[in-house]
Amino acid sequence: MGSKRRRATSPSSSVSGGDFDDGHHSTNIPGPSRKRRRLSNLPTVDPIAVCHELYNTIRDYKDEQGRLLCELFIRAPKRRNQPDYYEVVSQPIDLMKIQQKLKMEEYDDVNVLTADFQLLFNNAKAYYKPDSPEYKAACKLWELYLRTKNEFVQKGDAEEEDEDEEGHDSQELSSPGYLKEILEQLLEAVAVATNPSGRLISELFQKLPSKVQYPDYYAIIKEPIDLKTIAQRIQNGTYKSIHAMAKDIDLLAKNAKTYNEPGSQVFKDANAIKKIFNMKKAEIEHSELAKSSLRLRTPSNLTASKLTGPSSQGKGSVGDERNSSNKYFRNKRSAQGDRLSAITMALQYGSESDEDAALAAAARYEGESEAESITSFMDTSNPLYQLYDTVRSCRNNQGQLISEPFFQLPSKKKYPDYYQQIKTPISLQQIRAKLKNHEYETLDQLEADLNLMFENAKRYNVPNSAIYKRVLKMQQVMQAKKKELARRDDIEDGDSMISSATSDTGSSKRKSKKNMRKQRMKILYNAVLEARESGTGRRLCDLFMVKPSKKDYPDYYKIILEPMDLKMIEHNIRNDKYVGEEAMIDDMKLMFRNARHYNEEGSQVYNDAHMLEKILKEKRKELGPLPEDDDVASPKLKLSRKSGISPKKSKYMTPMQQKLNEVYEAVKNYTDKRGRRLSAIFLRLPSRSELPDYYITIKKPVDMEKIRSHMMANKYQDIDSMVEDFVMMFNNACTYNEPESLIYKDALVLHKVLLETRREIEGDEDSHVPNVTLLIQELIHNLFVSVMSHQDDEGRCYSDSLAEIPAVDPNFPNKPPLTFDIIRKNVENNRYRRLDLFQENMFEVLERARRMNRTDSEIYEDAVELQQFFIKIRDELCKNGEILLSPALSYTTKHLHNDVEKEKKEKLPKEIEEDKLKREEEKREAEKSEDSSGSAGLSSLHRTYSQDCSFKNSMYHVGDYVYVEPAEANLQPHIVCIERLWEDSAGEKWLYGCWFYRPNETFHLATRKFLEKEVFKSDYYNKVPVSKILGKCVVMFVKEYFKLCPENFRDEDVYVCESRYSAKTKSFKKIKLWTMPVSSVRFVPRDVPLPVVRVASVFANTDKAEEEKHSDTLDDSKVGESILHLEKDKEDVPVEMSNGEPGCHYFEQLCYNDMWLKVGDCVFIKSHGLVRPRVGRIEKMWVRDGAAYFFGPIFIHPEETEHEPTKMFYKKEVFLSNLEETCPMSCILGKCAVLSFKDFLCCRPTEISENDVFLCESRYNESDKQMKKFKGLKRFSLSAKVVDDEIYYFRKPIVPQKEPSPLLEKKIQQLEAKFAELGGGDEDMEEMGEEEGDITETPSMPQLQTPLTSELDIMPYTPPQSTPKSVKGSTKKEGSKRKINMSGYILFSSEMRPVIKAQHPDYSFGELSRLVGTEWRNLEATKKAEYEGMISGYPPVLPPLQGPVDGIVSMGSMQPLHPGVPPPHQLPPGMPGIPGIPPPGVIGQNVSPMVGTPAPGAGPFGQQIGILGPPGQQAPPPYPGQSPATQPVMQQPSTPMFVSPPPKTQRLLHSEAYLKYIEGLSAESNSISKWDQTLAARRRDVHLSKEQESRLPSHWLKSKGAHTTMADALWRLRDLMLRDTLNIRQAYNIENV
């Protein structure tokens, strides 16, 4: 688990049972003396704990709306966004910095933390305005901080405490009986308090911790105390006042907070107990004595009784609590029965031993309550419980519980690295929970989880740590107990079978297996039931739940003879109708088959049936095979188990183990077309003694046995871990072996099988990369909708008033029209790819509204409000740059306030002047109207004004609202507010007032919404005869309309007014102050306030119809426009280059072919002859003579690098090459992005498609062909005019998947083509496949990993795959049986290959081989028989030599070393016959033989020539050869082809060569050259300079092929020629002449 971690939550004063002797502090001690001792021993307050508590208090504080105030101070403003902040604040600090200092424990004093918080809040007050939320939050939090700090850091005076306590004593000593009841009530309040989830808060405070388990507790805490002690003191009458008990409660809480870490549960519980006690104390002090005494009854005593007794007696205190409860109820029933006092209960309990205390501590630490111990749900005789309890209660020699660190998992907060290393964490608490839920069926399953827990601890901790040693000890104990239980189980099983008695164990096993089968069927059924369609979420099983109706589908029951549905299957599962799982699967398949048979192919039901059957198969495959039923075994089998020593192998496998096993088996069991198992040679590594150079070349050897052992030991946390080991094994084989070898090919094929298997198992689980384009468009859409639907308190949308803004600003007539409606269409058509462009368009509309309207108008205020709201929602959606980093975020609310204030300063003087002129004009118009009305007639001079008048039995007053007859008959009556009433000289009554307009009487846009029954106060006033009044109505102000209603008026006659309407400007403005005359109507409150409902305009329907009418033509005209993305306005940004070339104009940002490019961008470049275009990065760009160019590094794809085919690459990985080029911009195909590994996981540029985003973490060096990681690409600092990319950050980093090398498939095809034309080996390969059983039974001793490669390598040699003892016998037996079949294909190939080569001179070797093979297959049988007859005429190959090499020349009948070598006068395939030159294998009689026996390992043949041995097993060797020591190494030198190069570079002339030839002649030497020196030369001993390499005869070979350099290819040619020389000598029996 972790020796690295400390206990996250320590026990307070009570984690364990009470083995502590309470005598020294539970005796009756007088209050004052005890208090003095406490003062002397008072533990100091931990400043770090106080600092943590203060920080948490500030962090968790919320205001009235539930918002965390600390969010405003989590991070200081960014310098880029708010540079003026750093002009005001010299020492910036934020909560993140304070938290970091807390974690690093830099605060050793509370005053240091106080200084930092003061600096934080002072900075906020200095920068923000007093009315801002930040300023107010800073003030609130600072007050909270000081208040909390004063609570923690108290400076009490001992003398004052003494005086207080004496005062309390004097007041309370007079009534000791009543005091005891009060104290019991306080104790009860503390003891029974629970948290919201029902957990008992006081549980850990009832008993002191064990001295054995927590000795440090008593070293830190000088005055331990628990609730049991407090209860005893209450019963003993130790407390003389409430204050004395309060002191002990404070001490209890302080002890817990001193010992435990801040933030732990115990720390919080201590504060809660103190708070509960104080609240109860205050309640009692303010209550009446009588009521208090009535409340104090037996429950308090019962609570004290529980606390005074030990927490665990026997097997727990459950029974004790029950007994005490019974006594309580029994005493309550008796009328005059004595109460069960707490002290009586205290005497009933004895003290615990340290053993019980430690166990109780462990039980509580694990989170088990006494009433819920493991024995309550499991029999102690159960083997599962016994194994678990043995591990859990394991102790060391000192009696300490060594399993304690494994009770709970480490804290994720403190040990995040634990959860990174350990993929499947598990603890004893989780194992206990699984035991409780009966999830373990066998001991093996429980053992698997315990082993997983131990392996996790061993994996995380170092071997010499204490935890690691504990793990080893516990594993030994567990294994010993497991063997004991298994042995006991076997004996019991055997006895029970003999006696034919049914044991409980056997019945439980049968029952559990039956339950397991039923559970599996339920899982499979639920998998089908819960399957849903990926796109729509539709349940696929809906049409399969019940059979079709016979009434609706009568033909169904004629076609389908056996109907089946899911309801019937579920019924059968519930009632145990199915004998096994197969029966249920058969019914499922029948149901799907019926659906496919009845419905047409391609229909929804048909497709659903297919999909559900696939899901069912996958789920069944995931569950794995059914466990075998051991219960049906015969008695003999049962008895035989007793003699078995090894325990049963576990049949229980986790889903991950099943996947790992499936991958391993797929690689192990793969066979080729001939049935040959390719993995046989990879099972085991060669020994160091046989092949030491293998371990020099390969640094990390691995074989399949090692992989299997890791898999069995659960060392693989996931499939990728196993795949890495397999890839390393195949890479080792490819590194050591030659590229043309069969082993090399087998490694590549198995590598491909491995990747395909993993893809099948994981379902090609490539990490899902979010679609950034859709996310940006969704963000913009959400932002637009939020802004457009933003409403005020009355439910009015602010955007309604802005809909009336003209699309074109008169000040800028050339600008394209832009309105919210246009923006909405752009958003719906997903034309925005950048947030800053969307923000520019929105702000342009809002700023136009501000420019064109007065500062006191409704439109202006709404525009400002919407702009503020836009910024707020934008920052929330982008999380201030944590989700989306955009230049748009640089415009903040502060910038908006500055712009608005500046605008108001410019406009206010003009508006004041306009108001003044308007008032003068209105005054003149009023005077004119009075003059005109005065001159109209004498009647106006004789007006009689009054406050009311009557008409048609109705009385009208000033302030009343009336309906007035309309001017036209088809119109609604006008609404007028009466302001004046008079009667003229003619006796006619008149009224004068303000007209109110209905919405249809105003000019407005169809998008505007109105309140129901809304009217508008107009600027139109006029007089009307009273005779035209049609009736009364009421117009109410909006603030009263929803709450009040007028008396004696119908609802139809009541209207609401919120705004005034100006007929001149055709605009609306909210009414802030209702100034209409007071009405005589009486208003009463509404029973239920009216809801605020807004309705669409009457013009909306007609406008919508017109819009639909023209929508088709609009769509046709703008179909292209909707597809095109909107681009942000950019400009060419020139830059001065100090070292630039003359005539070149350099740019940081440039537009080329409608494509905007900037320095640092990556682009696709035209690349001729490559599969994919290369990627270049622009580091400079310039224009010269009208042509544009750029310069920068080039990135290459994996297929352009040299690497082993087994290498894995990330998808879309590129490599930075050494090549830096200057390219014309005409070769640019498009833009792309190349990200570092870290950025590739976390973010994406928003304007680049995911297909064009690449990953680069390595640089490829062309000279040494190496890939090395580098820090990162060069970054550029560009001017402000350059438009930065917007970056979207993922909420969760993606996990990039790797893919095989692009060379893998090509290399496999090449090698298959090469080996395909070697038809002579077909039958031998089949024989090898037949003999493979021996190979798999005993893992092979790998052979040569550098086999010689040519057409002769059709039957490589594999040594006997058994122990050294059996080598001799098997060699003789198999060697006598084995015959080497020489096929006529070899002779046919030697004749046909030159012909095909002449016809197709450009074909490669592999292509020629395929054509030769095709010709051979198409050849008539008679022709084939002729070739077979010709080849049979050649002498057979003799068995390989068993003797030493000496004297080999004298053996006249020597045969070729390798079977299948061409016979005399037979041309090897592909080599045309040349007249005058003998074919290979034919040497003149005058050639001298070359004899020599080099020492083992001296020279290349020790590792490169096949070793003679029994040819019985011919598996291809991927690993170095392993031969018995008795077998000789056959070597035969040949005429040297190369001489070691001179140490210095020299010019070799013909004359110099001739002189050296003369010097080399010697009478003592039988040969002209020093062939023995040449034979001993090795590749690794010869180092050539570049000049020497350039002078090599590279023209001998067409190309270097699969070799790294031309020198390697020539060395390979030399080895082949030497081998051919040896074979020729042996095949043709060449003797000394």
From Swiss-Prot:
It is found in: Nucleus. Residues 42-152, 174-284, 379-485, 512-623, 651-761, 767-877 form the Bromo domain. Its main location: nucleus. Residues 1-40, 155-174, 300-333, 484-517, 623-644, 900-940, 1319-1377, 1509-1531 are annotated as: Disordered. One of its GO terms (biological process) is transcription elongation by RNA polymerase II. InterPro entries: BAH_dom (IPR001025), BAH_sf (IPR043151), Bromodomain (IPR001487), Bromodomain-like_sf (IPR036427), Bromodomain_CS (IPR018359), HMG_box_dom (IPR009071), HMG_box_dom_sf (IPR036910), PBRM1_BD5 (IPR037968). Keywords: Bromodomain, Chromatin regulator, DNA-binding, Nucleus, Repeat, Transcription, Transcription regulation. It holds the Pfam family BAH. Residues 954-1072, 1155-1271 form the BAH domain. GO terms for molecular function: chromatin binding; DNA binding. It comes from the Eukaryota. Involved in transcriptional activation and repression of select genes by chromatin remodeling (alteration of DNA-nucleosome topology). Component of the SWI/SNF-B (PBAF) chromatin-remodeling complex. This is Protein polybromo-1. The gene is PBRM1.
